[in-house]
A protein has these predicted regions:
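Conserved segment of winged-helix/HTH DNA-binding domains
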Residues: 69-94
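Basic amphipathic alpha-helical segments that dock to polyanions
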Residues: 45-49
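C-terminal regulatory/oligomerization modules of transcriptional regulators
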Residues: 92, 96-149
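Short alpha-helical segments that sit at the start of domains
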Residues: 1-13
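Beta-hairpin "wing" of winged helix-turn-helix
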Residues: 51-66
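A short alpha-helical element within helix-turn-helix/winged-helix DNA-binding domains
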Residues: 28-34
Length: 149
């Protein structure tokens, strides 16, 4: 089973944009940070632009957030890159001749819907600024530890 890392990669992109507002930031340099290719980064950035979460001008390596980081939620970012795709997916290729196989989807769907609702509510409470603040706290702690050693 392959898991999507689009959300974490897109948050990575947005944090880089937010903390590098004064610096040039090309899709190639962002891709290097994520260990991916610039084309993938451009696809993510295009989705962010369509969702009106970031702005950029073609040919200029200066993307920017379209609104303050404390007004962008993790749910906004998730919806921008994943659309209405649910977090959990049912296996619809089960054996129709098996009692469990034929009924498991309906049995699980109610629980998956609850999980989706709860996750979206929590994601809507977490802002990009919260993530940036946590990033700065972690880098500060790491720098302090390196100074001690």
């Amino acid at each position: 089973m392959k898991y999507s890392t689009k959300l974490s990669d897109t948050v990575h992109v947005m944090v880089l944009i937010a903390i590098n507002q004064e610096n040039s930031l090309s899709s190639a340099s962002i891709a290097e940070s994520i260990h991916t290719n610039p084309g993938f980064v451009r696809q993510l950035m295009l989705k962010l632009k369509k969702a009106e979460l970031m702005t950029s001008v073609a040919g200029h390596a200066r993307p920017s957030l379209s609104k303050p980081a404390d007004h962008i939620t993790l749910l906004d970012i998730y919806k921008a890159v994943e659309g209405d795709k649910p977090l959990l997916h049912l296996d619809t290729h089960t054996n129709p001749d098996c009692g469990v196989g034929i009924n498991i989807q309906l049995s699980l769907q109610e629980f998956y819907n609850e999980i989706q609702k709860t996750a979206e509510e929590k994601m809507n409470m977490i802002t990009l600024q919260d993530i940036i603040d946590t990033y700065y706290q972690r880098t500060s702690i790491e720098n302090n530890l390196q100074n001690i050693i």
